[in-house]
Amino acid sequence: MLDSSLAQEIAAIDGVELDSKVTFADLTTLRIGGKPRSAVRCQTTEALVSAIKLLDDASLPLLIVGGGSNLVVADGDLDVIAVIIETDDVSINLTDGLLTADAGAVWDDVVHLSVDAGLGGIECLSGIPGSAGATPVQNVGAYGTEVSDVLTRVQLLDRTTHQVSWVDASELDLSYRYSNLKFTNRAVVLAIELQLLTDGLSAPLRFGELGRRLAISEAEPHPRRPVRMVRDAVLELRRAKGMVVEHTDHDTWSAGSFFTNPIVDPALADAVFEKVGEPTMPRFPAGDGKEKLSAAWLIERAGFKKGHPGAGAKASLSTKHTLALTNRGDARASDLVALAKEIRDGVLETFGVTLVPEPVWIGISIDD
Protein backbone atom coordinates (compact mmCIF):
# COMPACT_ATOMS: atom_id res chain seq x y z
CA MET A 1 0.00 0.00 0.00
CA LEU A 2 0.94 3.62 -0.39
CA ASP A 3 1.89 5.76 2.58
CA SER A 4 -1.39 7.24 3.83
CA SER A 5 -0.36 10.87 3.31
CA LEU A 6 0.90 10.16 -0.22
CA ALA A 7 -2.24 8.17 -0.99
CA GLN A 8 -4.38 11.11 0.10
CA GLU A 9 -2.34 13.51 -2.02
CA ILE A 10 -2.64 11.31 -5.11
CA ALA A 11 -6.33 10.61 -4.55
CA ALA A 12 -6.94 14.36 -4.45
CA ILE A 13 -5.77 14.74 -8.06
CA ASP A 14 -8.72 15.29 -10.39
CA GLY A 15 -8.98 12.30 -12.73
CA VAL A 16 -7.19 9.81 -10.46
CA GLU A 17 -8.64 6.74 -8.76
CA LEU A 18 -6.76 4.46 -6.36
CA ASP A 19 -7.41 0.73 -6.78
CA SER A 20 -6.29 -1.66 -4.03
CA LYS A 21 -7.86 -4.82 -5.47
CA VAL A 22 -6.63 -5.10 -9.05
CA THR A 23 -4.03 -7.71 -10.06
CA PHE A 24 -1.84 -7.89 -13.14
CA ALA A 25 -3.93 -10.85 -14.24
CA ASP A 26 -6.76 -8.31 -14.53
CA LEU A 27 -4.59 -5.86 -16.46
CA THR A 28 -2.88 -8.08 -19.06
CA THR A 29 -4.16 -9.97 -22.09
CA LEU A 30 -2.28 -13.06 -20.89
CA ARG A 31 -4.35 -12.87 -17.68
CA ILE A 32 -1.27 -13.77 -15.68
CA GLY A 33 0.42 -11.86 -12.88
CA GLY A 34 0.33 -11.08 -9.20
CA LYS A 35 -0.72 -8.07 -7.18
CA PRO A 36 0.98 -4.66 -7.17
CA ARG A 37 1.48 -2.73 -3.94
CA SER A 38 -1.15 -0.35 -5.20
CA ALA A 39 -2.67 0.80 -8.48
CA VAL A 40 -3.31 4.35 -9.66
CA ARG A 41 -5.84 4.81 -12.46
CA CYS A 42 -5.39 8.02 -14.47
CA GLN A 43 -8.22 9.22 -16.72
CA THR A 44 -6.59 12.41 -18.04
CA THR A 45 -3.12 13.30 -19.25
CA GLU A 46 -2.84 15.99 -16.59
CA ALA A 47 -3.72 13.47 -13.89
CA LEU A 48 -1.18 11.01 -15.28
CA VAL A 49 1.62 13.58 -15.23
CA SER A 50 0.78 14.76 -11.71
CA ALA A 51 0.52 11.24 -10.29
CA ILE A 52 3.79 10.07 -11.81
CA LYS A 53 5.61 13.15 -10.49
CA LEU A 54 4.39 12.53 -6.94
CA LEU A 55 5.30 8.85 -7.09
CA ASP A 56 8.71 9.55 -8.63
CA ASP A 57 9.43 12.20 -6.00
CA ALA A 58 8.73 9.51 -3.39
CA SER A 59 11.23 7.20 -5.19
CA LEU A 60 8.64 4.45 -5.60
CA PRO A 61 9.03 1.72 -8.25
CA LEU A 62 6.42 2.19 -10.99
CA LEU A 63 5.06 0.07 -13.79
CA ILE A 64 3.18 2.05 -16.42
CA VAL A 65 0.34 -0.06 -17.83
CA GLY A 66 -1.76 0.61 -20.91
CA GLY A 67 -3.56 -2.24 -22.62
CA GLY A 68 -1.33 -4.86 -21.00
CA SER A 69 -0.94 -6.77 -24.26
CA ASN A 70 2.85 -6.92 -24.18
CA LEU A 71 3.57 -7.82 -20.57
CA VAL A 72 4.60 -11.03 -18.83
CA VAL A 73 4.32 -10.39 -15.09
CA ALA A 74 5.49 -12.62 -12.25
CA ASP A 75 3.09 -14.28 -9.83
CA GLY A 76 2.66 -13.29 -6.19
CA ASP A 77 2.94 -9.86 -4.60
CA LEU A 78 5.09 -7.40 -6.52
CA ASP A 79 6.89 -4.42 -5.04
CA VAL A 80 5.66 -2.01 -7.67
CA ILE A 81 2.99 0.64 -8.11
CA ALA A 82 0.87 0.07 -11.21
CA VAL A 83 0.06 3.34 -12.97
CA ILE A 84 -2.82 2.54 -15.30
CA ILE A 85 -3.28 4.85 -18.28
CA GLU A 86 -6.98 5.31 -19.07
CA THR A 87 -6.78 8.43 -21.24
CA ASP A 88 -8.70 7.89 -24.46
CA ASP A 89 -9.15 11.05 -26.54
CA VAL A 90 -8.66 10.76 -30.31
CA SER A 91 -8.77 13.72 -32.69
CA ILE A 92 -8.70 13.64 -36.49
CA ASN A 93 -8.05 16.45 -38.96
CA LEU A 94 -9.70 15.28 -42.16
CA THR A 95 -8.11 18.02 -44.23
CA ASP A 96 -4.47 17.14 -43.63
CA GLY A 97 -4.89 13.55 -42.39
CA LEU A 98 -3.35 14.13 -38.96
CA LEU A 99 -4.59 11.85 -36.19
CA THR A 100 -3.70 12.40 -32.53
CA ALA A 101 -4.47 9.78 -29.90
CA ASP A 102 -4.01 9.70 -26.15
CA ALA A 103 -1.71 6.95 -24.91
CA GLY A 104 -4.56 5.06 -23.25
CA ALA A 105 -6.80 4.93 -26.30
CA VAL A 106 -7.53 1.34 -27.36
CA TRP A 107 -5.39 0.83 -30.46
CA ASP A 108 -8.00 -0.97 -32.53
CA ASP A 109 -10.51 1.78 -31.72
CA VAL A 110 -7.99 4.25 -33.16
CA VAL A 111 -7.66 2.17 -36.32
CA HIS A 112 -11.44 1.82 -36.59
CA LEU A 113 -11.90 5.59 -36.29
CA SER A 114 -9.28 6.23 -38.97
CA VAL A 115 -10.99 3.81 -41.36
CA ASP A 116 -14.42 5.33 -40.65
CA ALA A 117 -12.88 8.71 -41.52
CA GLY A 118 -11.53 7.33 -44.81
CA LEU A 119 -7.91 7.72 -43.78
CA GLY A 120 -5.27 5.21 -44.84
CA GLY A 121 -2.01 4.02 -43.35
CA ILE A 122 -2.82 1.88 -40.29
CA GLU A 123 -5.56 -0.42 -41.61
CA CYS A 124 -3.10 -3.34 -41.73
CA LEU A 125 -2.65 -2.91 -37.97
CA SER A 126 -6.32 -3.69 -37.28
CA GLY A 127 -7.09 -6.06 -34.44
CA ILE A 128 -3.77 -5.65 -32.65
CA PRO A 129 -4.52 -5.53 -28.90
CA GLY A 130 -3.17 -2.89 -26.58
CA SER A 131 -3.13 0.88 -26.33
CA ALA A 132 -2.01 3.62 -28.69
CA GLY A 133 0.85 4.66 -26.41
CA ALA A 134 2.54 1.27 -26.72
CA THR A 135 2.67 1.31 -30.52
CA PRO A 136 5.76 3.51 -30.96
CA VAL A 137 7.58 1.90 -28.03
CA GLN A 138 7.89 -1.43 -29.83
CA ASN A 139 7.17 -0.08 -33.32
CA VAL A 140 4.12 -2.30 -33.75
CA GLY A 141 3.76 -3.87 -37.17
CA ALA A 142 1.82 -6.41 -39.22
CA TYR A 143 1.29 -7.35 -42.87
CA GLY A 144 4.08 -5.14 -44.13
CA THR A 145 3.08 -2.02 -42.19
CA GLU A 146 4.76 -0.53 -39.11
CA VAL A 147 3.72 2.38 -36.93
CA SER A 148 6.99 4.07 -37.93
CA ASP A 149 5.57 4.38 -41.47
CA VAL A 150 3.05 6.98 -40.28
CA LEU A 151 4.32 8.22 -36.90
CA THR A 152 5.27 11.90 -36.96
CA ARG A 153 5.88 12.60 -33.27
CA VAL A 154 5.10 11.47 -29.72
CA GLN A 155 4.29 13.43 -26.61
CA LEU A 156 6.58 12.34 -23.79
CA LEU A 157 6.84 12.89 -20.07
CA ASP A 158 10.51 13.01 -19.08
CA ARG A 159 10.68 11.23 -15.73
CA THR A 160 13.88 13.02 -14.74
CA THR A 161 12.64 16.57 -15.21
CA HIS A 162 8.90 15.81 -15.35
CA GLN A 163 8.66 18.11 -18.35
CA VAL A 164 6.21 17.32 -21.16
CA SER A 165 7.24 17.81 -24.78
CA TRP A 166 6.56 16.60 -28.30
CA VAL A 167 9.43 14.60 -29.77
CA ASP A 168 9.91 13.95 -33.48
CA ALA A 169 9.69 10.32 -34.57
CA SER A 170 13.16 10.61 -36.11
CA GLU A 171 14.61 10.84 -32.58
CA LEU A 172 13.25 7.44 -31.50
CA ASP A 173 15.67 5.19 -33.46
CA LEU A 174 12.72 3.24 -34.83
CA SER A 175 13.47 -0.14 -36.41
CA TYR A 176 11.93 -3.62 -36.50
CA ARG A 177 9.95 -3.98 -33.23
CA TYR A 178 12.22 -1.45 -31.54
CA SER A 179 12.50 2.14 -30.40
CA ASN A 180 14.86 3.71 -27.90
CA LEU A 181 11.90 3.90 -25.50
CA LYS A 182 11.55 0.11 -25.29
CA PHE A 183 14.02 -0.88 -22.59
CA THR A 184 14.05 2.25 -20.47
CA ASN A 185 11.80 3.93 -17.93
CA ARG A 186 13.14 7.39 -18.64
CA ALA A 187 10.02 8.59 -20.47
CA VAL A 188 6.29 7.88 -20.62
CA VAL A 189 4.33 8.20 -23.85
CA LEU A 190 1.35 10.51 -23.32
CA ALA A 191 0.08 10.78 -26.90
CA ILE A 192 0.98 9.96 -30.49
CA GLU A 193 0.51 11.81 -33.77
CA LEU A 194 0.12 10.00 -37.10
CA GLN A 195 0.19 11.33 -40.66
CA LEU A 196 -2.39 9.36 -42.64
CA LEU A 197 -3.49 9.29 -46.27
CA THR A 198 -6.67 11.16 -47.19
CA ASP A 199 -7.82 9.51 -50.45
CA GLY A 200 -9.69 6.60 -48.87
CA LEU A 201 -7.15 4.03 -50.00
CA SER A 202 -4.72 1.94 -48.00
CA ALA A 203 -0.99 2.38 -47.89
CA PRO A 204 0.71 0.31 -50.63
CA LEU A 205 0.29 -3.39 -49.89
CA ARG A 206 2.77 -6.16 -50.41
CA PHE A 207 2.00 -9.52 -51.98
CA GLY A 208 1.56 -12.32 -49.48
CA GLU A 209 -1.16 -13.75 -47.26
CA LEU A 210 -3.09 -10.48 -47.11
CA GLY A 211 -2.38 -9.76 -50.76
CA ARG A 212 -3.88 -13.08 -51.80
CA ARG A 213 -6.97 -12.40 -49.68
CA LEU A 214 -7.37 -9.07 -51.50
CA ALA A 215 -6.72 -10.58 -54.95
CA ILE A 216 -3.52 -8.59 -55.42
CA SER A 217 -1.32 -9.69 -58.29
CA GLU A 218 2.45 -9.87 -57.99
CA ALA A 219 2.49 -7.79 -61.16
CA GLU A 220 0.88 -4.78 -59.43
CA PRO A 221 3.73 -2.36 -58.66
CA HIS A 222 2.16 -0.44 -55.75
CA PRO A 223 -1.20 -2.06 -54.99
CA ARG A 224 -3.71 -0.17 -52.87
CA ARG A 225 -7.26 -0.99 -51.86
CA PRO A 226 -10.09 0.81 -50.02
CA VAL A 227 -9.22 1.08 -46.34
CA ARG A 228 -12.36 -0.66 -45.11
CA MET A 229 -11.76 -3.60 -47.43
CA VAL A 230 -8.24 -3.98 -46.07
CA ARG A 231 -9.34 -3.69 -42.42
CA ASP A 232 -12.03 -6.33 -42.91
CA ALA A 233 -9.55 -8.70 -44.55
CA VAL A 234 -6.96 -8.20 -41.81
CA LEU A 235 -9.52 -8.85 -39.07
CA GLU A 236 -10.64 -12.06 -40.81
CA LEU A 237 -7.05 -13.28 -41.00
CA ARG A 238 -6.27 -12.38 -37.39
CA ARG A 239 -9.47 -13.98 -36.04
CA ALA A 240 -8.66 -17.19 -37.88
CA LYS A 241 -5.34 -17.23 -36.00
CA GLY A 242 -6.83 -16.37 -32.61
CA MET A 243 -5.07 -13.00 -32.70
CA VAL A 244 -8.11 -10.83 -31.93
CA VAL A 245 -8.90 -10.82 -28.21
CA GLU A 246 -12.10 -12.71 -27.33
CA HIS A 247 -12.76 -13.22 -23.63
CA THR A 248 -14.23 -16.71 -24.13
CA ASP A 249 -11.45 -17.97 -26.42
CA HIS A 250 -8.30 -19.14 -24.61
CA ASP A 251 -6.39 -18.99 -27.89
CA THR A 252 -6.57 -15.21 -27.52
CA TRP A 253 -5.33 -15.17 -23.90
CA SER A 254 -1.87 -14.29 -25.10
CA ALA A 255 0.65 -11.51 -25.61
CA GLY A 256 0.16 -11.71 -29.38
CA SER A 257 3.18 -12.78 -31.38
CA PHE A 258 5.49 -13.96 -28.60
CA PHE A 259 8.77 -14.06 -30.53
CA THR A 260 10.05 -11.53 -33.06
CA ASN A 261 10.97 -12.75 -36.52
CA PRO A 262 14.74 -13.32 -36.31
CA ILE A 263 17.09 -11.23 -38.43
CA VAL A 264 20.12 -13.30 -39.38
CA ASP A 265 23.16 -13.43 -41.65
CA PRO A 266 22.49 -14.91 -45.11
CA ALA A 267 24.82 -17.81 -44.29
CA LEU A 268 22.60 -18.86 -41.39
CA ALA A 269 19.49 -18.47 -43.54
CA ASP A 270 21.15 -20.69 -46.16
CA ALA A 271 21.96 -23.29 -43.50
CA VAL A 272 18.33 -23.36 -42.37
CA PHE A 273 17.22 -23.75 -45.99
CA GLU A 274 19.64 -26.61 -46.59
CA LYS A 275 18.47 -28.38 -43.44
CA VAL A 276 14.77 -28.16 -44.29
CA GLY A 277 14.95 -28.12 -48.09
CA GLU A 278 11.64 -26.33 -48.65
CA PRO A 279 11.70 -24.04 -51.71
CA THR A 280 8.95 -21.91 -50.17
CA MET A 281 10.87 -21.19 -46.95
CA PRO A 282 9.96 -17.60 -45.99
CA ARG A 283 12.99 -15.31 -46.04
CA PHE A 284 13.01 -11.58 -46.70
CA PRO A 285 15.64 -8.84 -47.07
CA ALA A 286 16.09 -7.01 -43.76
CA GLY A 287 18.65 -4.35 -44.71
CA ASP A 288 22.36 -4.14 -43.93
CA GLY A 289 22.92 -7.42 -45.72
CA LYS A 290 20.70 -9.34 -43.28
CA GLU A 291 17.67 -11.54 -43.84
CA LYS A 292 14.46 -11.92 -41.85
CA LEU A 293 13.09 -15.40 -41.19
CA SER A 294 9.63 -16.39 -39.96
CA ALA A 295 9.57 -17.27 -36.26
CA ALA A 296 6.31 -19.20 -36.67
CA TRP A 297 7.77 -21.24 -39.55
CA LEU A 298 10.89 -22.06 -37.50
CA ILE A 299 8.80 -23.12 -34.51
CA GLU A 300 6.71 -25.46 -36.63
CA ARG A 301 9.72 -26.95 -38.44
CA ALA A 302 11.42 -27.53 -35.08
CA GLY A 303 8.58 -29.91 -34.26
CA PHE A 304 6.24 -27.71 -32.24
CA LYS A 305 2.70 -27.94 -33.56
CA LYS A 306 -0.36 -25.85 -32.83
CA GLY A 307 -1.63 -26.58 -29.33
CA HIS A 308 1.71 -27.94 -28.07
CA PRO A 309 2.16 -29.57 -25.57
CA GLY A 310 -1.46 -30.70 -25.79
CA ALA A 311 -4.73 -30.91 -23.92
CA GLY A 312 -4.50 -30.38 -20.19
CA ALA A 313 -1.49 -28.07 -20.31
CA LYS A 314 -1.89 -24.85 -18.36
CA ALA A 315 0.08 -22.93 -21.00
CA SER A 316 0.32 -23.98 -24.62
CA LEU A 317 0.84 -22.76 -28.14
CA SER A 318 -2.40 -21.49 -29.62
CA THR A 319 -4.41 -24.14 -31.45
CA LYS A 320 -4.68 -21.65 -34.31
CA HIS A 321 -1.21 -20.09 -34.55
CA THR A 322 2.19 -21.32 -33.35
CA LEU A 323 3.59 -17.87 -32.62
CA ALA A 324 1.14 -17.23 -29.77
CA LEU A 325 1.83 -18.66 -26.30
CA THR A 326 -1.48 -18.87 -24.46
CA ASN A 327 -2.98 -19.20 -21.01
CA ARG A 328 -5.49 -22.06 -21.11
CA GLY A 329 -7.37 -20.71 -18.11
CA ASP A 330 -5.32 -20.95 -14.92
CA ALA A 331 -1.69 -20.71 -16.03
CA ARG A 332 0.90 -19.07 -13.84
CA ALA A 333 3.88 -17.07 -15.04
CA SER A 334 6.14 -20.05 -14.36
CA ASP A 335 4.05 -22.19 -16.74
CA LEU A 336 4.46 -19.65 -19.51
CA VAL A 337 8.19 -19.30 -18.88
CA ALA A 338 8.67 -23.07 -19.11
CA LEU A 339 6.84 -23.18 -22.45
CA ALA A 340 8.70 -20.16 -23.85
CA LYS A 341 12.04 -21.67 -22.85
CA GLU A 342 11.13 -25.02 -24.44
CA ILE A 343 10.23 -23.33 -27.73
CA ARG A 344 13.27 -21.06 -27.78
CA ASP A 345 15.70 -23.85 -26.92
CA GLY A 346 14.12 -26.24 -29.40
CA VAL A 347 14.49 -23.81 -32.30
CA LEU A 348 18.07 -23.02 -31.27
CA GLU A 349 19.00 -26.70 -31.11
CA THR A 350 17.35 -27.47 -34.46
CA PHE A 351 18.45 -24.48 -36.52
CA GLY A 352 21.03 -22.50 -34.56
CA VAL A 353 18.65 -19.53 -34.54
CA THR A 354 17.89 -17.77 -31.26
CA LEU A 355 14.32 -16.51 -30.97
CA VAL A 356 13.92 -13.30 -28.97
CA PRO A 357 10.73 -12.76 -26.94
CA GLU A 358 8.74 -9.66 -27.85
CA PRO A 359 6.95 -8.96 -24.53
CA VAL A 360 8.36 -6.98 -21.61
CA TRP A 361 9.14 -9.14 -18.57
CA ILE A 362 8.30 -7.91 -15.07
CA GLY A 363 9.73 -9.75 -12.07
CA ILE A 364 10.53 -12.82 -14.16
CA SER A 365 12.39 -13.72 -17.35
CA ILE A 366 12.67 -16.51 -19.89
CA ASP A 367 15.94 -17.54 -18.23
CA ASP A 368 14.43 -18.00 -14.75
Curated annotation (Swiss-Prot):
Q: Name one GO cellular component term.
A: cytosol
E.C. numbers: 1.3.1.98
Which positions fall inside the FAD-binding PCMH-type domain? 32-199
Coiled coil location: none
Q: Which UniProt key words apply to this protein? A: Cell cycle, Cell division, Cell shape, Cell wall biogenesis/degradation, Cytoplasm, FAD, Flavoprotein, NADP, Oxidoreductase, Peptidoglycan synthesis
Q: Which cofactor does it need?
A: FAD
Q: Which GO terms describe its biological process?
A: cell division; cell wall organization; peptidoglycan biosynthetic process; regulation of cell shape
Q: Which SUPFAM superfamilies match?
A: FAD-binding/transporter-associated domain-like (SSF56176), Uridine diphospho-N-Acetylenolpyruvylglucosamine reductase, MurB, C-terminal domain (SSF56194)
What is this enzyme's catalytic activity, as reactions? Answer: UDP-N-acetyl-alpha-D-muramate + NADP(+) = UDP-N-acetyl-3-O-(1-carboxyvinyl)-alpha-D-glucosamine + NADPH + H(+)
GO MF terms here are: FAD binding; UDP-N-acetylmuramate dehydrogenase activity
Where is it mostly found? cytoplasm
Q: In which pathway does it act?
A: Cell wall biogenesis; peptidoglycan biosynthesis
Localization of this protein = Cytoplasm
Q: Which residues form the active site?
A: R177, S257, E358
The UniProt entry's sequence similarity note says: Belongs to the MurB family.
Q: Which NCBIfam families does its entry note? A: PRK13903.1
- Physiological role: Cell wall formation.
Protein's recorded name: UDP-N-acetylenolpyruvoylglucosamine reductase
The organism named in the record is: Corynebacterium glutamicum (strain R)
The beginning of the lineage is:
Bacteria, Bacillati, Actinomycetota, Actinomycetes, Mycobacteriales
